[in-house]
Amino acid sequence: MVDAAVLEKLEAGFKKLEASDSKSLLKKYLTREVFDKLKTKKTPSFGSTLLDCIQSGLENHDSGVGIYAPDAEAYTVFADLFDPIIEDYHGGFKKTDKHPPKNFGDVDTLANLDPNGEYVISTRVRCGRSMQGYPFNPCLTEAQYKEMEQKVSTTLSSLEGELKGQFYPLTGMSKEVQQKLIDDHFLFKEGDRFLQAANACRFWPSGRGIYHNDNKTFLVWCNEEDHLRIISMQPGGDLGQVYRRLVHAVNEIEKRIPFSHDDRLGFLTFCPTNLGTTLRASVHIKLPKLAADRTKLEEVAGKFNLQVRGSTGEHTEAEGGVYDISNKRRMGLTEYDAVKEMNDGILELIKIEGSL
């Protein structure tokens, strides 16, 4: 049974959300009917409740989505809420749909988006992975955090060639190293209010760490929002090179760490927006003419399934006319197709900018 205090919190939170002018997907799909059906359910292995899934969205009415999965089973137990949100966010991925098997495609077919270096400042491709046998952030114990960090650190330390580098645990990290990594945009800070409210920051900084290779083009975040965020990036627009490095890294890590995967949803992540390929391919790009009107920029980007963010990440404004633009769709298509969609869209945006 779900205890009375949790039910009370749910009821109060639901009423507030209902009365709010929140634009979140949570508000859109959490009808009274769905709410009543799910409020007394729990996931079998970890006892996660509806509150664990939606408390961030109940607290932050300005959420875009407002829901997280406390453990892998939540996607099934609370499917009546997750499925419509997934379908809405991922461009019509229906509950009868199946995410295709992993396919990184032919990495050699992607080239430099901006060979003359006029528009693209940097290129980045990342994916998220969850380690099999562990729940997501809200259910992890401190001992599990430490055990996971140990596994990740050992695995990454054995990487060779271009991926060779060093693992820095957040615990006991000197202020200087910490600040340097933040300035490099490498380090993650303790979660924002959206993640805090989702209980994703417990036992901080235990079990959290960062790895980067010697030339700072390959990064792994351990236990930030997801168990693993694997990131390949470099200055300029050479998407082919960035993607090739990511694919190589993911394949190497997967040989040593089994990842959580679901036949229908693909690779499992804490936030439903990252499911499937989990892949986000992005550029920091200057498009001064298009960007003079952000609404117009977003409209054009939307046509190519691209998402526009401010240059310092989610929930931020653009600095100096530099935008972060990425593929929006991560589900129902292969890894290669997700990157290709971003590739084609960015080339179109550059073409439009050049013609203005």
From Swiss-Prot:
- Can you tell me which residues bind ATP? 122-126, 185, 229, 280-284, 309-314
Classification via Gene3D superfamilies? ATP:guanido phosphotransferase, N-terminal domain, Glutamine synthetase/guanido kinase, catalytic domain
Which PANTHER family would you find in this protein's record?
ARGININE KINASE 1-RELATED (PTHR11547:SF38), ARGININE OR CREATINE KINASE (PTHR11547)
Residues in Phosphagen kinase C-terminal domain copies: 119-356
Q: What is the lineage of its organism?
A: Eukaryota, Metazoa, Ecdysozoa, Arthropoda, Hexapoda
Can you name the source organism? Answer: Schistocerca americana
An example of a Gene Ontology cellular component annotation for this protein is: extracellular space
Q: Which GO terms describe its biological process?
A: phosphocreatine biosynthetic process
Q: Which UniProt keywords apply?
A: ATP-binding, Kinase, Nucleotide-binding, Transferase
User: Known EC number(s)?
Assistant: 2.7.3.3
Gene of origin? Answer: ARGK
Name of the protein: Arginine kinase
Q: Which family does it belong to?
A: Belongs to the ATP:guanido phosphotransferase family.
Among the Pfam families in the record, one is ATP-gua_Ptrans
Where, by residue number, does substrate bind? 64-68, 225, 271, 314
Q: Catalytic activity, per the record?
A: L-arginine + ATP = N(omega)-phospho-L-arginine + ADP + H(+)
| Recorded GO MF terms | arginine kinase activity; ATP binding; creatine kinase activity
